[in-house]
Design a protein with these regions (language model features):
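Short beta-strand-centered segment that lines the nucleotide-binding/catalytic pocket of NTP-utilizing
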Residues: 26-39
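Conserved glycine(s) of the Walker
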Residues: 15
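Active-site signature of alpha/beta-hydrolase-fold catalytic machinery across serine-
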Residues: 22
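The conserved Walker
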Residues: 11-12
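Hydrophobic anchor at the beta1->P-loop junction of P-loop NTPases
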Residues: 8
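Walker A (P-loop) ATP-phosphate-binding motif of ABC ATPase nucleotide-binding domains
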Residues: 5
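Hydrophobic positions on the alpha1 helix immediately C-terminal to the Walker A/P-loop
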Residues: 19
Length: 130
């Protein structure tokens, strides 16, 4: 079976997590870092960098074990995807990027103004060197 790293990107409420759960692969996203062992989500902005480090670490561990991975994060800016492109190359994983563009309403209470700012900062992924 082919080792695969799938990145699912999109604005909050676009269906990233829902789509990721349909893949036969280990699923990680930075938001998982903020879920406690009782399943309660508690976002802490000051820990966002740690959440992304955790997500990258879990992805690398799975790929090193030859387990395919799907990562669902907003990935608004190209540089946010760059570590994953490097991981795919390092572990010989086939890379796929999927963009979610629907608007189902976000479950984490992200303010509409914040989503608009993210929209304005959105960059296409194709120009990221692989």
């Amino acid at each position: 079976m082919t080792l695969k790293l799938t990145l699912i990107r999109g604005l909050p409420g676009s269906g990233k997590s829902t789509l990721a759960k349909t893949f036969p692969a280990n699923h990680y996203e930075a938001d998982m870092y903020f879920v406690d062992n009782k399943g309660c989500y508690s976002y802490q902005a000051e820990k966002l960098a740690l959440a992304h480090q955790w997500c990258q670490s879990m992805t690398a561990k799975s790929l090193a074990r030859k387990q395919s991975v799907v990562v669902s994060n907003t990935f608004v800016r190209r540089w946010e995807m760059a570590p994953y492109f490097k991981m795919a190359k390092r572990y010989g994983a086939k890379l796929e990027v999927i963009e979610c563009t629907e608007n189902f309403g976000n479950i984490h209470g992200v303010e509409p103004e914040t989503i608009e700012k993210m929209k304005k900062r959105w960059q296409e992924w194709q120009s990221v060197p692989q």
